[in-house]
């Protein structure tokens, strides 16, 4: 569990909160082996991460940001249409792609996945966290993870 890179924030949270792997399994309604598998693979779905933090009484927010360029305007107006009643887990990803003019076709090529894969992520409103890290690296973005009590 100490070798985690993608889930390092989760390992640190569990240590700080005093939450064991057994407790995570009980909260999530899965076996200890499933939790162990997440840490061995160093990956889990965004929906699973958000659900776990909600069950622990915390809110986790992901954001993808690029470093501000010197030639950009200091004011940024972002119009984002997100259905508040609908799924919003990957809204941060959609907003970042729109804000930085990243086409889904070019992103699919950089990640070496099909366009259908990206379509399925947004249709199901879920993807593995390792892909979020891969997108951040491919598009020279920083993944910001904020955790706060509910």
Question: Where are the model-predicted features located?
Answer:
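Short alpha-helical "recognition helix" segments of helix-turn-helix
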Residues: 23-25, 106-108
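N-terminal flexible/basic segments that precede or flank functional cores
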Residues: 1-3, 42-43, 50-85
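A short, Lys/Arg-rich alpha-helix, primarily the initiator
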Residues: 1-17, 72-101, 146
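Conserved, charge-rich beta-strand/loop surface module that forms ligand/interface-binding patches
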Residues: 89-105, 114, 120-125
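DNA major-groove recognition helix of helix-turn-helix/homeodomain DNA-binding modules
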Residues: 47-63, 129-145
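Helix-turn-helix DNA-binding elements, focusing on the entry/boundary residues of the two helices
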Residues: 21, 104, 132
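Recognition helix of helix-turn-helix/homeodomain-like DNA-binding domains
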Residues: 29-44, 112-127
């Amino acid at each position: 569990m100490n070798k985690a890179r993608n889930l390092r924030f989760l390992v640190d949270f569990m240590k700080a909160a005093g939450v064991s792997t057994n407790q995570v399994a009980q909260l999530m309604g899965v076996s200890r082996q499933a939790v162990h598998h997440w840490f061995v693979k160093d990956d889990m779905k965004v929906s699973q991460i958000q659900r776990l933090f909600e069950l622990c009484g915390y809110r986790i927010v992901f954001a993808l940001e690029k470093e501000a360029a010197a030639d950009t305007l200091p004011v940024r107006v972002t119009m984002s249409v997100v259905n508040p009643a609908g799924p919003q887990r990957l809204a941060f990803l959609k907003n970042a792609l729109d804000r930085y003019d990243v086409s889904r076709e070019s992103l699919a090529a950089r990640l070496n996945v099909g366009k259908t894969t990206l379509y399925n992520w947004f249709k199901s409103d879920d993807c593995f966290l390792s892909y979020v890290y891969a997108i951040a690296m491919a598009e020279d973005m920083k993944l910001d993870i904020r955790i706060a009590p509910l």
